[in-house]
UniProtKB/Swiss-Prot annotation:
It holds the Pfam family FlgI. GO terms for molecular function: structural molecule activity. Keywords: Bacterial flagellum, Periplasm, Signal. The lineage of its organism: Bacteria, Pseudomonadati, Campylobacterota, Epsilonproteobacteria, Campylobacterales. Assembles around the rod to form the L-ring and probably protects the motor/basal body from shearing forces during rotation. InterPro entries: Flag_FlgI (IPR001782). The keyword Chaperone does not apply. It is found in: Periplasm; Bacterial flagellum basal body. This is Flagellar P-ring protein. HAMAP family: FlgI. The keyword Signal applies. Its main location: periplasm. Belongs to the FlgI family. The gene is flgI. GO terms for cellular component: bacterial-type flagellum basal body, distal rod, P ring; outer membrane-bounded periplasmic space.
Length: 348
């Protein structure tokens, strides 16, 4: 039976974090790269003859090696056309390794065990910034409809690309230094201003709005030294609750205290009722699932004690009922849409 893996984040409501954990330095960012390539060596799980662009790509590749083949004569199913994406970090240097994501474009069944051939990765300006090549592994997953393992047509290759071109940077000469909060919040912006001005003993920070803090470097410090000191300062921070669901691996990551409000929803043949009664007990036809949950097998209804209605508990109980990861994802989305989950929901 396919199950969803649940990770709980145990944390206090308010704790100290470094500024670099809650804010980015404006101008210091990743750049997206993309390329088109071929994965070969697949065990009959590649693109079929209906993926004409794959056949044409194979023909073009062979023609570059002085081998002429008509695309219509190619019948191999051991090759798949893929899009390759990567992030080029700020200040990346020639020779640095990048992680890449390889995703099938055609009707391939799996990329497992294949090899990505030399693929140029370009930026938005059309220039080549990295070259990718290497063996593909999808983590040993096999395609299974409706649950974890259904994404063997995409894979991440660690260190699968080499940086060939650097993006020019003038950070050391930049006089306009700005912090941008990852999550807009007036209190956090104000706290950053207060802490930095106290630490440096002068007005080096000014909160402009809920996301922006302008910085003014002291004359006796370089940009690098100044930003290093800025980003390591601690501030009091209350994180925004979030539930993250990895659709590919079937993993739920949630804070231990992410609660679900009283609600009644139905998905396919499963009904979920969050009982506002904190002292609910099992009815005559219900089975006690422990952890405050009761299931009625005749109607496939899951009733949960409001005091125990957290995202983690609901996901765990749905697992016990045999719900697929895709079902659980859909239920979480519906709970969020109904305003019952007091947290941001992110599907990756």
């Amino acid at each position: 039976m396919r199950v969803l893996t649940i990770f709980l984040l145990f944390m206090t409501s308010i704790f100290a974090v470094q500024i670099k954990d809650v804010a980015n330095t404006v101008g210091v960012r990743d750049n997206q790269l993309i390329g088109y390539g071929l994965v070969v060596g697949l065990n009959g799980s590649g693109d079929g003859t209906s993926s004409k662009f794959t056949l044409q790509s194979i023909s073009n590749l062979l023609q570059g090696m002085n081998i002429k083949v008509d695309p219509n004569d190619i019948k191999s199913k051991n090759t798949a056309a893929v899009m390759v994406t990567a992030k080029l970090p700020a200040f990346a240097k020639s020779g640095d390794k990048l992680d890449i994501t390889v995703s099938s474009m055609g009707d391939a069944k799996s990329l497992q065990g294949g090899t990505l051939l030399l693929t140029a990765l370009r930026g938005i300006d059309g220039e080549i910034y990295a070259i990718a090549q290497g063996s593909i592994s999808t983590g040993g997953l096999t395609p299974r409809p409706g649950g974890a393992g259904s994404h063997s047509t995409a894979a991440t290759v660690m260190g699968g690309a080499n940086v060939e071109r650097e993006i020019p940077q003038n950070f050391s000469q930049n006089s306009d230094l700005t912090l941008s909060l990852k999550v807009a919040d007036f209190k956090t912006a104000n706290d950053i201003e207060r802490v930095l001005n106290t630490v440096f003993g002068e007005e080096v920070a000014k909160a402009i709005d809920s996301r922006t803090v302008k910085l003014k470097k002291p004359e006796d410090l370089s940009n690098v030294d100044f930003m290093a000191r800025v980003l390591e300062q601690d501030i009091a921070y209350k994180p925004q609750s979030k539930v993250i669901i990895d659709e590919r691996t079937g993993t739920v990551i949630a804070g231990v205290d992410v609660e679900v409000e009283p609600v009644l929803i139905t998905h396919k043949d499963i009904t979920i009722k969050i009982d506002p009664n904190n002292n609910a007990v099992a009815n005559q036809n219900e089975i006690d699932m422990k952890d405050g949950g009761f299931v009625d097998p005749s109607s496939n209804t899951l009733r949960i004690n409001n005091a125990k209605s957290t995202v983690a508990n609901i996901a765990r109980m749905l697992n016990k009922l045999g719900a697929t990861p895709n079902d659980i994802i859909a239920i979480m989305e519906n709970l969020k849409r109904a305003g019952a989950i007091n947290a941001d929901l992110e599907i990756i």
